[in-house]
Amino acid sequence: MVKVGITGPVGSIKAEALAKIMEMLANEGKIIEGFLVSEKVEHNKLISYSVMDILSKKKAEFARQDIVSRVKIDKLGVDTRLLEDIVIPSLERAKSEADVIIIDELGKIENTTKNIKNIIEDVLKLDKTIIVTLHKKSRNPVLQEFRSLESVRVFDITPINKNILPFKILKVINGEEESI
């Protein structure tokens, strides 16, 4: 099974491409599970991050400025319990039920807790189609490990290719284009 990474600039084009890919996979009857991360920005300032279980739609705002925590993402305090309460059940269920597993913002999420890191590492070893979004410049060990896995294709999304990339990725997932 192919593992796809989508990298790109900060902003919404990764999320838009991922949403399009998920829509096309759902139209093919694929069971898609995992989690999505969204950010809330006001006046060009990052306010918070939320995480959502794709299947149950359960959502939590897990990172904000006013959360006091040793764990931080982009200077925001992280409520690790809220994050674990969504990410871990979502990925546990996906391991057995999903055709395609989504891990959004791999570089930001996996180092928040040992439990999250462990389940993400387990999921990445599965023989399933996995789509992750990655921060473009991250030197994170988990990202390096992801890039070194077998049958991984990493696509860099840009404003120029953002409309065609979802179709190209779908072809790779469906085995219509060589993945190595």
Curated annotation (Swiss-Prot):
<feature type="binding site">
    <location>
        <begin position="100"/>
        <end position="107"/>
    </location>
    <ligand>
        <name>ATP</name>
    </ligand>
</feature>
<comment type="function">
    <text>Has nucleotide phosphatase activity towards ATP, GTP, CTP, TTP and UTP. May hydrolyze nucleoside diphosphates with lower efficiency.</text>
</comment>
<dbReference type="GO" id="GO:0005524">
    <property type="term" value="F:ATP binding"/>
</dbReference>
<comment type="similarity">
    <text>Belongs to the THEP1 NTPase family.</text>
</comment>
<keyword id="KW-0378">Hydrolase</keyword>
<protein>
    <recommendedName>
        <fullName>Nucleoside-triphosphatase THEP1</fullName>
        <ecNumber>3.6.1.15</ecNumber>
    </recommendedName>
</protein>
<dbReference type="InterPro" id="IPR004948">
    <property type="entry name" value="Nuc-triphosphatase_THEP1"/>
</dbReference>
<feature type="binding site">
    <location>
        <begin position="8"/>
        <end position="15"/>
    </location>
    <ligand>
        <name>ATP</name>
    </ligand>
</feature>
<keyword id="KW-0547">Nucleotide-binding</keyword>
<dbReference type="Pfam" id="PF03266">
    <property type="entry name" value="NTPase_1"/>
</dbReference>
<keyword id="KW-0067">ATP-binding</keyword>
<dbReference type="GO" id="GO:0017111">
    <property type="term" value="F:ribonucleoside triphosphate phosphatase activity"/>
</dbReference>
<dbReference type="InterPro" id="IPR027417">
    <property type="entry name" value="P-loop_NTPase"/>
</dbReference>
